[in-house]
Amino acid sequence: MTKSIYFSLGIHNHQPVGNFDFVIERAYEMSYKPLINFFFKHPDFPINVHFSGFLLLWLEKNHPEYFEKLKIMAERGQIEFVSGGFYEPILPIIPDKDKVQQIKKLNKYIYDKFGQTPKGMWLAERVWEPHLVKYIAEAGIEYVVVDDAHFFSVGLKEEDLFGYYLMEEQGYKLAVFPISMKLRYLIPFADPEETITYLDKFASEDKSKIALLFDDGEKFGLWPDTYRTVYEEGWLETFVSKIKENFLLVTPVNLYTYMQRVKPKGRIYLPTASYREMMEWVLFPEAQKELEELVEKLKTENLWDKFSPYVKGGFWRNFLAKYDESNHMQKKMLYVWKKVQDSPNEEVKEKAMEEVFQGQANDAYWHGIFGGLYLPHLRTAIYEHLIKAENYLENSEIRFNIFDFDCDGNDEIIVESPFFNLYLSPNHGGSVLEWDFKTKAFNLTNVLTRRKEAYHSKLSYVTSEAQGKSIHERWTAKEEGLENILFYDNHRRVSFTEKIFESEPVLEDLWKDSSRLEVDSFYENYDYEINKDENKIRVLFSGVFRGFELCKSYILYKDKSFVDVVYEIKNVSETPISLNFGWEINLNFLAPNHPDYYFLIGDQKYPLSSFGIEKVNNWKIFSGIGIELECVLDVEASLYRYPIETVSLSEEGFERVYQGSALIHFYKVDLPVGSTWRTTIRFWVK
């Protein structure tokens, strides 16, 4: 008998909530459009497609002609639409109720627009945890696709993976297909004949096997060099022609069609996992380095093929431990979710939950070779939607809440007024973790800490050429000299932190590493008290250090669009004290070099990316997003300011990313015995 094998091609198309229109348009022109146009001309070649809900909404609005083409392909049975969480959340980190609702939302959208009831779903970043079976099944889904690494880790071999299995949780069943890592690296990078050879190797006479590639649509045109190879040089045309030429060997098929023809291979219980690269990225830098050394050792000793299934890496949720900013966003999402769920108004709840769903979009919560967490506009979008959700709720009063917000074992204080949210950390020197301007749904202090990443060691041998490689194998840089701005912070970049310097600081030294200049920096636990009346709320932090007492107050008002911050330093020793005192605020208004975004100091404008030292009683920030911030000081300070820039990886290589601006206000404070120095700073936001 003739050997044969089914082949199923799945295309996953996604854009993050908050991404720029021009970025999505470029992805459309280079990938989404030419790929569907190609398969539209090949109606006998079935494909599976997953579009995230955010991208579908964008396509429906901006390219209705594309929608019409998808409808035709669905009607003729060529396309099988695959569902997922509507806004592409990482399912394990959102509330269980939302797991089901996000999937059902996309199910309904696909049915309403294309007339299909999805049977399968795409799992965002293929992040799998065993309990998901129950919630996915409750949403009406019959199968998911995950990486073959999940299967290898429980002892299955490559020859066992050309079919599908059944998973079970509390009696709920869900089919699961393995995505071939081999095909992920062959398509569309290798000669199409190599794919045919690989499929031939595992073909069988009983016609029961299937090989699955389900991967990013962006790799067909948007990834570096792929538009040229896939379309201009004809890789895709050659690939499909090769499949058709070998029709006796290879049968293209949709996944659900295959399920109706072939029984499952058995029952399986998969561990927590994602694709192999993700499980490397989630590790801390030293652990990543050790994993790389282990992999290299196994390869050198020709043991990799045998033992690689058991070399797993980390666990996705640990991104919430690796990056405080990621954890903060996720805990804010849970906090806002709880407030929305407690609302007695169902109409308000529905509108607010739509914002929460968008605030669950996965992209800003993690980082690998894609920008992710390092992209300020993606973090900004998460905060925008979560603050908008809060704004649907009752906001006319001032209130506070004390609890362990970020689940680190220490209480935080959340203060809310009609204009602002302040997230305060007594355990981190009474600093501000988050400062929201609710009128514009904008987090003013959305700044990322400069951290060491494992890939920073690769900067020494980057190149401008990396053609023909998967983006997982490329080391390129978008500009020269990035190693010269590679600095690391020794604390999280929060605001209203205090420092005592040995002498008047040097700006360049502050920029590189302010901790080297500090005699004291106050990141330990502060005592606090809260006073509230019907018009304002005051949170006072205090501590005694080296003979002086430091007090810091935040005052929010019910009907005022400003915040007062008051510092008092009292000499409680028996000798006079002289201090080089400074306090720091870190702000991010997103556009460091745009003419509509600038500092105004005196009558001079400076880009947000600029360095400077000025004597000030006030300064302003103007932004193109319609927010103006003014800082008014009653005691003149020396203002030291510099841009906070990170070096991170994206699909196009190493890049510089503006994360915000640091503003350190410096004072020489002389304190006779028993005396107190005091200053009030008022921040107007409008």
Curated annotation (Swiss-Prot):
Places the protein is found: Cytoplasm
Catalyzed reaction equations: Endohydrolysis of (1->4)-alpha-D-glucosidic linkages in polysaccharides containing three or more (1->4)-alpha-linked D-glucose units
Enzyme class: hydrolase
GO term, biological process aspect, one: carbohydrate metabolic process
Enzyme Commission identifier(s): 3.2.1.1
Keywords associated with the record: Carbohydrate metabolism, Cytoplasm, Glycosidase, Hydrolase
CDD domains in UniProt: GH57N_TLGT_like
Principal place of residence: cytoplasm
Coiled coil spans: none
Cystine bridges: none
Name of the protein in its database record: Alpha-amylase 1
Phylogenetic placement of the source organism: Bacteria, Pseudomonadati, Dictyoglomota, Dictyoglomia, Dictyoglomales
Underlying gene: amyA
